[in-house]
């Protein structure tokens, strides 16, 4: 039986109606500050928490509920005689329902130029303490941190007069997750203040479920999608406009495609399968970029993931509607484009903003995490070195830079053949580099003649250059750094190939 409830919330969504419902059920309400004002201004009877404690709010509101008459009322074990005697001796009222959510710390630190002092003042102390007390004593007390529960709680109280034990346990679990995520946000903010960088002494993060997925990489694997609490970027901020629910593999491929297409400032299109590009292209129009990307490997494009870095127009949509695609993602779609694409009921249309730079990548391993900064180093042609007798032409330079931006997104060992506007062949994930080169060159076919080749890491031997020469490759870009670089340079010189060393490796595992 719930007789007394304590309400103290920062997010006042639904709190007035909830308080009204509690009062109608005969529950006595105690409240604090702005919550009390909102309730009483609505004509609902509620008592200030001072009527419990005998102490006023003090120190600019820092001390309101940190009092034995509050926490004794929450933490007392109801069927423990000693606890009951202590309550009677000290005039402590039992508190059966605690409704609390916390100061808006994440929202505060998200403001531009927020001061440390302002951030500190938005660290809640009394709130988490009440939440944890009530969650600990969930056998007797209900703890509510999410306004979404208000209606169902009122319904349960009307029907049963109390909250079922199993339901209180679920609320307690949610409450501990709520305070844990809150503390993670504070610790990470302080890490930033201390300039601890992307790899601090403790790596903390909190996530909330977006949705269950049909299955994982394979049908026998269970899966769900979670987003980082308090952030609004990347896959966690995607907006699905149309189509079936996303799968695990869709989201993995979408991440790869989205990072790839934003390598370019010109209109660009990338088509992805298993995180590797079937085709990628730039052009003066989005339509032409997509057509070129599709024609790079029209067989593999079937059932692919398409990423575009411009608003999708009707002409591009019409072209994409001609084949089966799993996902199309872009920063926006025109109404005309949506009308065309939504005629295909299963295709997933995703709207998403440009990726933020300076993020970290995290990989779960048994018993730990691997954390690294993203492979988004800013590169400049001026820092590259031409190591062959033949210099690249300006057209070849453009092709080399195009290929170099893409090859880092291909699974190692990675070889990519292109001209200055589109991919021609991609060799991914082979255990030796010359094997990847053979795949890419075979895919490029006759188009390899006069094209360029990019390699994500150095050539351990001269055989890759020799293979490229047989197919007519005109220029090569690679990191260099092998103890046998001279073999590759000699092979390039003998074939009249221009070769550029970047001194930067781009492995992708």
Segments from the language model and where they lie:
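Short, glycine-rich nucleotide/cofactor-binding loops
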Residues: 5-13, 247-249
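Glycine-rich phosphate/pyrophosphate-binding loops
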Residues: 137, 141-149, 267-278, 419, ...
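Feature captures the catalytic cores and cofactor-binding loops of soluble hydro-lyases/lyases
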Residues: 13-18, 22-69, 73-77, 82-93, ...
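Internal alpha/beta core interface subdomains
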Residues: 3, 16, 92-227, 238, ...
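Short beta-strand segments
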Residues: 8, 75, 98-103, 144-145, ...
